[in-house]
Amino acid sequence: MNWVPSMRKLSDELLIESYFKATEMNLNRDFIELIENEIKRRSLGHIISVSS
């Protein structure tokens, strides 16, 4: 998928904001998991309590 690497261009703040907005809007679970994976990759899971 071409757009997944684009998540790396998002700031940490925008990535976290996107996660909360996506969950609030009940967006597609696969999309939310992509965001969660990027959050974990950046070691930011503690901010949103993403389980490993």
Curated annotation (Swiss-Prot):
UniProt record, GO biological process: sporulation resulting in formation of a cellular spore
Pfam families from the UniProt entry: Sda
Site feature Important for interaction with KinA, where: 25, 27, 31
Record keywords: Protein kinase inhibitor, Sporulation
UniProt GO molecular function: protein kinase inhibitor activity
Effect of residue 25 to A/I: Partial loss of ability to inhibit KinA autophosphorylation
Function of the protein: Mediates a developmental checkpoint inhibiting initiation of sporulation (by preventing phosphorylation of spo0A) in response to defects in the replication initiation machinery. Inhibits autophosphorylation of the histidine protein kinase KinA, forming a molecular barricade that prevents productive interaction between the ATP-binding site in the catalytic domain and the phosphorylatable His in the phosphotransfer domain of KinA. Probably also inhibits the activity of KinB, but has relatively little effect on KinC.
Subunit structure: Forms a stable heterotetramer with KinA (comprising two molecules of each protein), by binding to the KinA dimerization/phosphotransfer domain.
Record's protein name: Sporulation inhibitor sda
Organism: Bacillus subtilis (strain 168)
Organism lineage: Bacteria, Bacillati, Bacillota, Bacilli, Bacillales
